[in-house]
Amino acid sequence: MPPAPKNGSAANAWRSERNARPREVWRAIVPKNLMADDTTRRLLAVAGQLQTLLFQIELLKRCDPEVLVKRALRAKIKHNALMVLYLHSRLAGDLAAQAAHRLTVGIYCLWMWLRRACSEAAALANEIDTYATYRDKDRFFSATMNLSPGGTCRLHSLVGLSLYGRTQDVTRELGLINDAENLLKQINYCHLIVSTESAEAALVGVDEFLTATVGGGMVASPETYDHTQPCCICLDELSVTANQGDTIYKRLGYSVCDHLVKQVKVNVTPDDVLRHMPFLNSVDANTLRGAIDKLRGSSGGEVGGGRRLAGVVPTGCRAEVGRSEQEDGAPAGDDRADLEHEARASRILDSYDVFTEAPGPVYRLSELRYWLASGKAAGAKTRGSCAHATHQATVLQKLDTDLSAMFARAETFERECRSAEREIFGTSFAHFHRHVASKIASVRGVGGGGEALIDKLLAGSPATAPEAEIETLISSCYSHHMSLPLFSRLGNPEKADTDALVEILKSYRDQTRPRADKAGGRAEDGAGDCDDEGYPGAADATRRGQRDWIGRVRVDTAAVADEHEDKVKKLLDRAERDLTTRRKNYAERLSARSFSNLDRCVKNQRAELEKLLRVNVYGAALPAMYVELKNGFLARQAFMKAVTSDESQHIRRCRLAREDVEGYEQHQYVRSALMRTSLDPAALPHLASRFYELVSGPMFRRHVERFPQPPNTSLYFTVENVGLLPHLKEELASFTRTYAHAEWMVSEFREFYDFSGISGVSETQRAAYAYIREAVFAAALFESIFQCGRAKLMRADSVEVDAGGPLLTDGIYLTFEERFPLIAIWGVGEDRRLCATSVVVTEKDLYAVLYAVLHKQDK
């Protein structure tokens, strides 16, 4: 095709010729990849618009219905609802056909959002009309927010799953998206004993639940998920990271799932909210400017400029101001008490000498004084940098004090918003959070202050971003821990010394008080011998201590001190230096370890806190899991439809009757030949890998990825994600360790993959494993004995499917369907489709289908 002219009459002629060409010609001219890219772009644009509409609908549900009725929004909402219905009429047929053929994550999300947008937009438009008639806000919010007490919760549904054999149907209740994820993993594990029809019915229920949750838009409601339950991606991540000696299950217990719903950092300031107040676009500019000027004059500052209204000082701010004023003033009472304790201790110690029998508390007091004196110099240097304020409040009181300023800002912001609305619009809007504020406050009042505090944190506020709440809570956590005695001693050693001094003085006082009581009539004399502080017994103890237990007379201690002053001073200096070094090293090591543990603990709790308070949006993990599992059963369904369809021209041979004498002879011929030859034990590892490939679920196909992993990895994730019991995992691992014919040859004539008479999920699953093991071992022996080529075993749910159907190759397919478990195909065309020369043999006997493969050239 010649290039398009740039301009002139030739360009016009070229455009006319282009428009005259039929669409099929243009499809032939335009490359397919360009058409696919254009379609993808269009679908992404539609998906983005649907997601935006769903988010706006969620906002309008919480808006004052008077605004929706009086202003032009009512017509716009109905217009959007009609546009969504138009899109549904144009796309629903193709999307439904695509969902029944093969899915991608993008197509499935678009299909979910389109269905949900139709129902939500129509419901909102109807409720607005109802409110325009009855003017009942309670009714409007109850209907839009699904708060009716007698109504059914759309987030609770029952999903049933039928299994092979006499096993009763399994029923699961879906209330959280975690429940849906667990059910998908369970179906993935039990795919060997689930028919296509049963899986399709169960997946329809899961699809409806996902449409009601994930299909509702971006933001995930807190009642739809539980971040403490790990998902399959959590297990995958922990499987490739260092375990630090802990088991995978212990580490999963401490994990915070961020895959089903992903947290998003939202830093919105009150200025941003005020700057983007709703409905301002419809307000006249002069009216808006005049209202802003009036609000500035009444508040004494800028509206939305970060300043508070004049005269409003939050409770928490007043507490901080009072605390700072107290710190800037005279020394606190605690410091004066410390000085008094030290003076009293000095007077008590001075009343005892080597000739005086001192009680036990005095010795402890002397030792403490020694340690205090040796560490005094180091303590004086670190007093200013390590001192911390002592918090006397309880944890909740301290937390409430720290958060009061933040809550006060939210209340002030709410008052400013109401003032702005009254000034601009003439009324204050009764949005959802304001309409139910009194009810929420009454519920909070029943639980007490602690529950009200937690409720405020979880509910949040337009004036406070989640990040600000998180930082405030973390700061409060550090402040609380630093106020504990352990960290106070690490941060301020002198505080620990003072506490020990007080304890020793108290103990000494308790021991000396009984002596003063026994004095009786000598109380007045004893009072005269008290020290200046009135400490009883000090002077009396001095008089009674003139002679000790060996009868030594008091000596002149001053002369002794003068004689040995130099030696003692050198010894004390050396001991003090050594002691200072040891204390410093010990304190540094203990402080580093303690603060490291505290930081690690706070870091772990911070992850929990961030997940709880941040805005969470639905991730792509759950839709991707649904798509992978659904595509597996869709591939099995497409395969069965292709080989059993009457429209195909291939040769079909269906052998299912048990009265077939010829088939029985074929069965006996192959079975007898296999029983005369034993399996090579060296081939067991390879056969085990083939077994793992066939039994692993369609959701985890790690062995067929671009960078394939061993097949046992796929099976590992299949069984670990459902919490399979250890003895069942050991039994599954040992399935391929035996090679005796009597143990692995389990099927009789035309009874392959027959579960009649078997009940229980574990027993049915065990029988399916036994049948597949028999197929793997029999095919390997068949190849080695008859030398007729490879008897390739394949899975029907692993075939590639395109617009024309499944792409096949010659071999034996395991369908995992109880009615048609084995299908042998040969003679596939070059395009990997069934043609007139293709032969399809449907069997229920393993050895008869091997006989058919052996004689395929004769047929």
Swiss-Prot record:
Role description: Component of the molecular motor that translocates viral genomic DNA in empty capsid during DNA packaging. Forms a tripartite terminase complex together with TRM2 and TRM3 in the host cytoplasm. Once the complex reaches the host nucleus, it interacts with the capsid portal vertex. This portal forms a ring in which genomic DNA is translocated into the capsid. TRM1 carries an endonuclease activity that plays an important role for the cleavage of concatemeric viral DNA into unit length genomes.
Regions of compositional bias (Basic and acidic residues) in chain numbering: 512-525
Top-rank taxon, per record: Viruses
Zinc finger (C3H1-type): 231-259
Subcellular location: Host nucleus
Official protein name in the record: Tripartite terminase subunit 1
InterPro entries according to UniProt: UL28/UL56 (IPR000501)
GO process terms (BP): viral DNA genome packaging
Recorded family membership: Belongs to the herpesviridae TRM1 protein family.
Primary location: host cell
Binding site for ATP: 782-789
Quaternary assembly: Associates with TRM2 and TRM3 to form the tripartite terminase complex. Interacts with portal protein.
GO molecular function: ATP binding; zinc ion binding
Keywords: ATP-binding, Host nucleus, Late protein, Metal-binding, Nucleotide-binding, Viral genome packaging, Viral release from host cell, Zinc, Zinc-finger
Segments of this protein annotated with the region Disordered: 512-542
GO CC terms, sorted: host cell nucleus
